[in-house]
A protein has these predicted regions:
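Intramembrane alpha-helical segments
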Residues: 1-63
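Multi-pass membrane catalytic core of lipid/isoprenoid biosynthesis enzymes
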Residues: 1-17, 110-139
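Hydrophobic alpha-helical transmembrane segments of multipass integral membrane proteins
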Residues: 4, 23-30, 76-79, 134-141
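Alpha-helical transmembrane segments
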Residues: 13, 17, 24, 33-37, ...
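Cytoplasm-facing juxtamembrane segments at the starts of transmembrane helices
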Residues: 39-47, 98-99, 122-132
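Functional transmembrane core segments of multi-pass inner-membrane proteins
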Residues: 48-94
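Cytosolic, membrane-interface loops and tails of multi-pass inner-membrane proteins
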Residues: 85-125
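Juxtamembrane boundary at the C-terminal end of a transmembrane helix
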Residues: 140-148
């Protein structure tokens, strides 16, 4: 609601074009969060577009008053980063929330056996998520430093 209110103020004071971004953003939030239209917008691809690419396109347009190749490339990069995060986090979240029991083992070629449990299965994707989060903070800081 706050973003929509700010968008309306910006649309009135700056440019009517912002209303397109405000309307689309409002629809994305409603359709995704409420599962409208048979959950067609509640997918990994829509998540990546809605929370990765779309904010980049919106903020780029607000700052440049145009969308160009740089905006598209930045949006695609953020789409892919968000999709990566979603790909890693979905199975981890599923194991944490829904698994009652996880057991098994991996037998290596040298005869060694590694025990599988929920913690060992989610350890690698969780570490990747932590590193991805840290990378985004450093990337954002670098972009900010570049602009200052």
């Amino acid at each position: 609601a706050g973003a929509v209110a700010l968008g309306i103020v910006a649309g009135i004071s700056e440019s009517r074009w912002i209303f397109a971004f405000v309307a689309f953003g409002g629809l994305i939030v409603a359709f995704y969060n409420l599962g409208l239209w048979n959950n067609r917008f509640h997918t990994d691809l829509w998540f990546a577009f809605s929370w990765g690419a779309f904010p980049v396109l919106t903020s780029y347009w607000v700052n440049a008053s145009r969308l160009d190749l740089a905006a598209v490339l930045l949006a695609v990069g953020c789409f892919l980063l968000t999709l990566t995060q979603r790909t890693l986090s979905t199975p981890v979240r599923s194991i944490r929330r829904r698994a009652i029991k996880v057991e098994g083992e991996i037998q290596l070629a040298n005869g060694e056996r590694l025990t599988l449990d929920s913690e060992s299965i989610i350890a690698v994707p969780e570490r990747a998520l932590l590193l991805l989060g840290a990378a985004m903070v450093v990337l954002a800081a670098g972009l900010l430093a570049f602009r200052l």
